[in-house]
Amino acid sequence: MSQQTHTTKKKLESAILVGVQAQTDEVFDFESTMEELASLSETCQLNVQAEFTQNRQHFDNKYYVGKGKLEEIKAYVEMNEIDVVVANDELTTAQSKTLNGNLNVKIIDRTQLILEIFALRARSKEGKLQVELAQLDYLLPRLQGHGRSLSRLGGGIGTRGPGETKLEMDRRHIRTRMNEIKHQLETVVEHRERYRNKREQNNVFQVALIGYTNAGKSSWFNALANEATYEKNLLFATLDPKTRQIQINDGFNLIISDTVGFIQKLPTTLIAAFKSTLEEAKGADLLLHVVDASHPEYRVQYDTVNQIIGDLDMGHIPQAIIFNKKDLHEGAVPTTNLPSIFVSSKNEADEEKVKQLLIEQVKSALTTYEEKVPSADADRLYFLKQHTLVTEIKFNETDATYTIKGFKKE
């Protein structure tokens, strides 16, 4: 008698979203942050049933929402047997504890969701250390009275959280672990800085791809570097920075780096933890800002990235804009006062357009030069083709020399 094996699909936890549109918090677009919260929740395998929002002058210090709204939420949670309540903001210890006590379900905030996704996406040792550092930094002030609200951060989904044993550590042990991680990351930073300094000494032009999460940075990195990088339609698909040398304009080499994507209300703990990753963009000569032009809130996303770039003291670095996903865009062509191009990573012909944009930006950032090179000096000719943007090579028969014109770094 043959045995049949039945696989049971794990039931998703049911969840509701709760957001407060505070008058004191006008930096972010509230509706788009709630839409993002739904995407973040679904990425964390939560089955979102409903959302509750409230306009207030400011967040309630005790309940996050007003007491009347809390009663409304409680009634819905009990009637529909909801498992998780997700807040659109980072909750204080008191807010989390009070909500947990009143609703008697898991309470998760936006920061925890993003930390969970980062833990899921981290592949390299550096990425995993950075995520753990951010998790512990989030946990440290919440050690007392965390109740059920931190159960997911403690490995509730798989084993990606710091683990229940770490949740039981006292502050001293957590600080010790954080210092250990920082020390390990310092080694990575020093290694990366040596490479970056070497590139700078060799006058290599450096480009960093930046943008909102899921804007298409990895797709363009793949196209320009001729590399099959991870480019699925996922939030925060790229955590570990990738740096490659690419060639444009018949020999001229430049360095291009892919970086972590940004999002509204990106937790400060993550920005701090991923400082070493973001340092790669800080050393760039050009920021190539990829924007999902098909997204209805692409202007908000564009502004969010620029705000974070400013916070990271990178606002002085020249930018060029790739308005991406032209194939999905409807409506007017997006515009900006910065150099820009409107393309689709799905269209191979657009790759040359992006390279041409790069060439124009390289020219504007470099200094013109003219140099005579003896025809016998093949090494010098090769060096100039590799490390400068050559625009003209003219052979002089009278003295058997080449006159080279182009652009180079100071």
Predicted features by range, described:
Residues 34-40, 75, 91-96, 100-101, ...:
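Conserved C-terminal guanine-recognition region of P-loop GTPase G domains, centered on the G4
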Residues 2-6, 31-35, 58-74, 240, ...:
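Switch II of P-loop NTPase G domains
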